[in-house]
């Protein structure tokens, strides 16, 4: 399984995106050790029972938690009566619910901290949760009146190249997102039972549920849902899905940096103790000034001709370095 790493802020433009990616990493820092601990405890109890079938919950407690630190653990029910496949599925639901909480919190934070002050409505949040997102970047988020020519020209290509992602697959990722989101809704609101919305999302997702269309080595999926029957979930598939959530956040972040609202993010990160200087009229020196500004604030470096695109924006606000 892929190891999640902490993200440098320069990997994405917005602080909210960086924090969301780090929160996904933190979720795995909890789930993976918990997975190992559960498997280990089961193996210890299974070996002990093989030697003595008459052991009780009290005996297991003395083996696993001799200092009785955790109260109320029913070892028989948790590690004998409950099959591992059921316990692992509970982990999968826990992780899935966390992934959507992270994504929804990311969208909410972007809206409240940055975009709500630039004539966006609550649609800003909802659009980030549904297929059709690629078109929404053109028709809603980055329209002519909301586009920053300076940030688009200076940063979009740099961040896109650094991401190594295929932006044309975003719609496929969103179909997968909606499929797992409806599964999560069944978990939260329908007692794990499959809804018609889940079946519809499944039918929309299946045509693109291939390694090629998702650019993955293994397709995240759920057993075909049956209306009114419990939804079956595997931890391995949720782990795979988490990679697509990361891609959705990164691709969305890079598209949203092209907005005039993103200029607020760009300048809000200026330290209060920096000295204000006028941008040099010498192109070479101006490039160095802007690159230092970008580095200090943990944005990706600009290169070559792109430096000219942001000069007018920097000049308006002066330059902090």
Placement of each model-derived feature along the sequence:
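Extended intrinsically disordered or low-complexity regions, especially N/C-terminal cytosolic tails and loops
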Residues: 1-127, 205-321
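Short non-catalytic regulatory patches outside canonical folded cores
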Residues: 108-174, 189
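Short flexible/disordered coil segments
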Residues: 138-143, 180-195, 254-271
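Short, glycine/acidic-rich beta->alpha junctions
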Residues: 87, 91-94, 168-171, 179
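Histidine-centered, metal-coordinating catalytic motifs and their short helical/loop contexts
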Residues: 172-209
